[in-house]
Amino acid sequence: MKLFVGLGNPGKEYEQTRHNIGFFVIDELAKRWNVSLKTAKFRGLFGTASVFGEKVALCKPLTYMNLSGECVCPLIDFYDIAVDDVIIIYDDLDLPPGKIRLRLKGGSGGHNGVKSIIHHLGTEQFKRIRIGIGRPTNGQPVADYVLSRFTEEEKPAVMEAVLRAADACEQAVTTPFIQVMNDFNE
């Protein structure tokens, strides 16, 4: 089973924030694949489907971002999912809004949700789809910036990036990730 995890924060006040862009992708995939996300015992919203003949799972952790590993790791253990079949989708300050970047592995890049997953999994060897949110340009603290909403000017590029990330996830169901990286990395 392939597991797609979109990182974000639970609650209405965070719904459309930059930090929740991973949730946007999971919502898009749930719509495409007709997956109903339900609360699971793993402190997250979870659903499964068969896509292109392959079993897939979608997850939106309901822990706060900094505790994402507390949802993801028990889920991986319970369903006996190989770490190689896990793709984590999240926001990236170092990419401009609208850009996506796929990686086979790596450090956290300062992202607390990814830090939590690395800590709980005990490895950096999992696939990622990073979606650019840019950096604050007006001196706004990063912690406030990631919890802010996209500007009207940014929204078209961001929504296009969400669709491209969802397309990459779809391709990753049946295609080696290295090929997906070649097709989607700019």
Curated annotation (Swiss-Prot):
GO molecular function, one term: tRNA binding
InterPro entries attached to this UniProt entry: Pept_tRNA_hydro, Pept_tRNA_hydro_CS, Pept_tRNA_hydro_sf
Gene3D superfamilies in the cross-refs: Peptidyl-tRNA hydrolase
One of the GO biological process terms: protein quality control for misfolded or incompletely synthesized proteins
Highest taxon of the lineage: Bacteria
Protein localization: Cytoplasm
Name of this protein: Peptidyl-tRNA hydrolase
Organism: Geobacillus thermodenitrificans (strain NG80-2)
